[in-house]
Amino acid sequence: MKKYKILLVIGDGLGDRQVASLNGRTPLENADKPTIASLLRSSLVGLMDPIGPGIVPGSDTSHLAIFGLDPKKYYKGRGSFEALGAGAILTEGDIAFRGNFATVDSNLVVIDRRAGRKIEEAEDLVKELNDKIQEIDGVKVRFYHGTEHRVSVVLSGDNLSDKVSDTDPHEVGKRILNSEPTDDALSSKRTANIINALTRRIYEVLSNSQLNDKRVREGLPPANIVLLRGASIHTELPKLKDYTGLSGAAVSATALIKGVCKSLGMEVVTPPGATGGIDTDYMAKAEAAAKLLEDHDLVFLHIKATDAASHDGKVSEKVKAIEMIDRSIGRVLDRYGSELVVLFTGDHATPVELREHSGDPVPLMLYVPTNIIPDNVGDFNERQARKGSLKITGLNIIDLLLNFSNRATKYGA
């Protein structure tokens, strides 16, 4: 029996609701999708609750579920995924934080939580931090630049804990917060003290940086602090190959998603031009996915643009992103061939009028190049998906892919 290779395509934040400016249609309904339309002739269609009905997923928890790991068991926080995606090599027990370069005044009151967002000097500022802050109280400190204003911070040492609060006040006009232990463990108190000492040292280094002097002269906000949030302790996850038998690879430019995939032991590729935003090079990502299919059983193509447009409330950009995803799938089929299983869905809904994640179910399409009984739907969108046969959660996806690629093993005798 032929074993088909698998293309898993996730449009981040794909799901939506009726949009007033589209006369009650959704972005998926409004988008031109010729490739997807051609695949419907041999596809199962339906709705997926990434975690469960009504549960609002994060991108981290939803991707864990989609790859077959129950987030209620395996999710330990976002920080370590972000750090792995930014290039960190973590060992069991390391504590990782998400961070933002930000601007504060001399009283450490936040003026700009992202220091202008696009910081050309970010890589050099991270290098300066790594050169000048190598340890605090015997604990090794490492900084990693993600994208734009994003920074990951990793602590390595003994008696550390992730049970500490953020220093990020999450609002402009408020002073940065002292990190506090969130339980009674001595390791938590120690870690909070280290974080507070580290924050003071970061401010000292960045406030005296010539790179920030240059930014001020140019009328730009200085990136003179790193706001920390989302502490997580690194624990090893099961590897995709071990629990599915699938050799997996991923194409993504988003640090969080790259980190999740690295945690699962997947090869991760970010081609030139892939940005993790609406300006990404879709065709470069599609070409990379097609090439990876030559050597892997499953290739995951992640597109962040749909979510970015949704958070900005830009419906036309979300429609365009969906149309470019359609073209990307077509490019993979042109380059690799159509004898593969294709699953297209979102990791969660981000309605453009809401501008936030929601607990709405997400439409899902599963193309199988064999004689299945397809669902009789006229288009792929939220409305038509309600007529399809699939009503699943994220944890069902891997089993569906294994079954329809002829790789599943019997459950029982």
Swiss-Prot record:
GO terms classed as biological process: glycolytic process
InterPro entries for the chain: Alkaline_phosphatase_core_sf, ApgAM_prokaryotes, Metalloenzyme, Pglycerate_mutase_ApgM
Class of this enzyme: isomerase
Keywords, ordered alphabetically: Glycolysis, Isomerase
Gene Ontology MF terms: metal ion binding; phosphoglycerate mutase activity
Transmembrane intervals: none
EC number: 5.4.2.12
A Pfam family the protein falls into: PhosphMutase
Alphabetized CDD domains for the sequence: iPGM_like
Pathway(s) of this molecule: Carbohydrate degradation; glycolysis; pyruvate from D-glyceraldehyde 3-phosphate: step 3/5
Family: Belongs to the BPG-independent phosphoglycerate mutase family. A-PGAM subfamily.
Protein's job: Catalyzes the interconversion of 2-phosphoglycerate and 3-phosphoglycerate.
Name this protein carries in UniProt: 2,3-bisphosphoglycerate-independent phosphoglycerate mutase
Species of the source: Metallosphaera sedula (strain ATCC 51363 / DSM 5348 / JCM 9185 / NBRC 15509 / TH2)
Annotated gene: apgM
